Amino acid sequence: MSEINISAAAVKELREKTGAGMMDCKKALIETSGNFEEAIDFLRKKGLAAAAKKAGRIASEGLTAAKVDGLTGVVVEVNSETDFVARNEQFQDLVKDIANLAVIAKTIDTLKTSKMQSGKSVEEEIIENIATIGENLTLRRMDILEISEGAIGSYVHNEVVPNLGKISVLVGLESNAKDKTKLEALAKQVAVHVAGNNPQSIDDSSLDQALVERERKVFFEKSKEEGKPDNIIEKMVEGRIRKFFSEVVLLQQNFLFEPKLTVAEVIKNAEKELGAEIKIAKFIRYELGEGIEHEEKNFADEVAAITQG
């Protein structure tokens, strides 16, 4: 079959529509004699056949999403291989739909088998999107926050569209305060604080004790090397542990919006103002790709690979 002329504009449009690679889009248009809809189907079929291969590739980009429905909130992370796909409207819609279902599903196993509007399960829908988008996609994780009364604050940092971005945070404030507007505003502020300060726990008692002991050991050895007497070393270590707590424990951190006050002091002031007890029940902070090994690529090599052939 002689190769027909395919315009760069057609290739670009198909890539924007499907998220598939430039060369894949060009080949699809050639194989379908330039028929746009048939080219989309060609990519879908080709992608489904190659889904198993794509599943072996590292997916560390993508999006996190936060969704609040009354007294329930969820955060999900769906990964892709490239940031380019995260800007693809089809992928964004997929993540939004998954987050909406997560509120009802409550666990990731239930979520994976939940039916989407298409009638397919979330897992099946992801496989189909691997076909059209042309990258490995994975539903990596989800977490749920539920409170009996109060307010849930949500914040998404580096949003690409509303509620989708690089960092998603939920904060649940348990309270019977009557002024829900002020309580919700406080929950939102604490969520922004959590995004920026990345606390490891709500209070020191819930902090991983293995982490505390590791820090204590490091501080002890450092103080010992400085040649201090044992009684001084003990005081120095305790002082450094207190400083460590102020850096990683939410209630002891200086509040982002009022740096002279700790989060605990801000909560106490709000309790006085609203005339009700306020408790931080839970927070969730997802940062895209945290803990995933990233594959290092040379940009020049990537461009060369795309333009070859």
Curated annotation (Swiss-Prot):
> GO cellular component terms?
cytoplasm
This protein's major location comes to cytoplasm
> Residues annotated as region Involved in Mg(2+) ion dislocation from EF-Tu?
82-85
Task: Extract the GO molecular function terms from the UniProt entry.
Answer: translation elongation factor activity
State the Pfam families in the record: EF_TS
- CDD domains, per database record: UBA_EF-Ts (cd14275)
Compartment annotation: Cytoplasm
Report the Gene3D superfamilies cross-referenced here: 1.10.286.20, DNA helicase RuvA subunit, C-terminal domain, Elongation factor Ts, dimerisation domain
Write the record's keywords in alphabetical order, separated by commas: Cytoplasm, Elongation factor, Protein biosynthesis
The similarity comment for this entry is: Belongs to the EF-Ts family.
Q: What does this protein do?
A: Associates with the EF-Tu.GDP complex and induces the exchange of GDP to GTP. It remains bound to the aminoacyl-tRNA.EF-Tu.GTP complex up to the GTP hydrolysis stage on the ribosome.
Q: PANTHER family, alphabetically?
A: ELONGATION FACTOR TS, ELONGATION FACTOR TS, MITOCHONDRIAL
Question: Could you identify this protein by its name?
Answer: Elongation factor Ts
